[in-house]
């Protein structure tokens, strides 16, 4: 417990760009956050001002004669904006499940093919772990969601004229919140990235296409986030080994039976399985084998 507790270095979400932080990014891209609120550190003095601003926005909306419930705000353009933001930042592939459901709740039908077509034309503008070495705090310092959203709007990849919780539409989300004289104000960002190893302009992206590919074959369909996969591992050719459970793979690893090139096929996983099990615990043993030079995939 002590070692586990020591691994958590502060309040808030985990600092890698996983599902929780992808949620934050997409809420910004949908205009459902106070602009710039996504990755402000919990202990930053700006956080309380943003929280107070959120309360003000909620009350102003409720009391307004032009009350805009979420059902009016989330339309096709808003859903597409979120999809583009996910692809432009190399966000979590879990959202290829979540966003299909969210869109359906809004009466909009999307599927993996839509993500794939958008990915082919959406530039990759961010490099945040696991797509790069930076964490979300460094991403925020380099310009964060505001920089990415501004670039995507100016390059024509996002719809700016949508209903948002902040008056002014999505362009307001391309500005940075700052604290001045104990007040919250938003300022324009510099035109250039403050750290091109973390975030880039739409003219000079990390990749011309978003970090996603749709794979199809005689076993079915899958998606892979290639922005997080080194190029020398884009193609793996090896014999398949079939397991009926994650525990079987772990047991085979412990017995030393996996010291070779192979592709692991783990059955009874994924969205249709009971509880939709994830495969996080298989990452360490597979990484050990990769570090030994074996060509391994799952």
Segments (PLM) and residue ranges:
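Catalytic or ion-coupling anion/metal-binding cores of large enzyme and transporter domains
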Residues: 1-298
């Amino acid at each position: 417990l002590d070692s586990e507790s020591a691994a958590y270095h502060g309040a808030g979400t985990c600092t890698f760009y996983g599902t929780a932080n992808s949620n934050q990014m997409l809420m910004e891209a949908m205009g459902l956050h106070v602009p710039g609120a996504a990755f402000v550190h919990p202990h930053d003095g700006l956080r309380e001002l943003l929280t107070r601003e959120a309360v003000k926005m909620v009350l102003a909306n409720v009391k307004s004669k032009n009350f805009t419930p979420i059902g009016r705000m989330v339309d096709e353009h808003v859903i597409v904006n979120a999809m583009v933001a996910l692809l432009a930042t190399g966000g979590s592939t879990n959202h290829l499940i979540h966003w299909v459901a969210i869109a359906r709740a809004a009466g909009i039908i999307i599927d993996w093919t839509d993500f794939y077509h958008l990915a082919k034309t959406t530039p990759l503008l961010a490099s945040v772990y696991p797509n790069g070495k930076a964490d979300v705090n460094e991403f925020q310092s380099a310009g964060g969601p505001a920089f990415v959203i501004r670039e995507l709007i100016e390059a024509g990849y996002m719809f700016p004229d949508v209903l948002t919780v902040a008056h002014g539409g999505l362009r307001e989300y391309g500005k940075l919140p700052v604290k001045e004289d104990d007040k919250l104000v938003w300022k324009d960002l510099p035109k250039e990235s403050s750290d091109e190893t973390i975030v880039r302009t739409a003219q000079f992206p990390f990749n011309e296409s978003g970090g996603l590919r749709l794979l199809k074959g005689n076993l079915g369909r899958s998606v892979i986030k290639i922005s997080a996969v080194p190029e020398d591992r884009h193609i793996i050719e090896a014999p398949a080994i079939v397991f009926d459970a994650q525990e079987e793979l772990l047991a085979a690893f412990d017995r030393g039976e996996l010291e070779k090139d192979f592709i692991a096929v783990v059955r009874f996983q994924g969205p249709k399985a009971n509880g939709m099990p994830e495969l996080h615990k298989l990452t360490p043993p597979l990484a050990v084998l990769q570090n030994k030079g074996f060509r391994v995939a799952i």
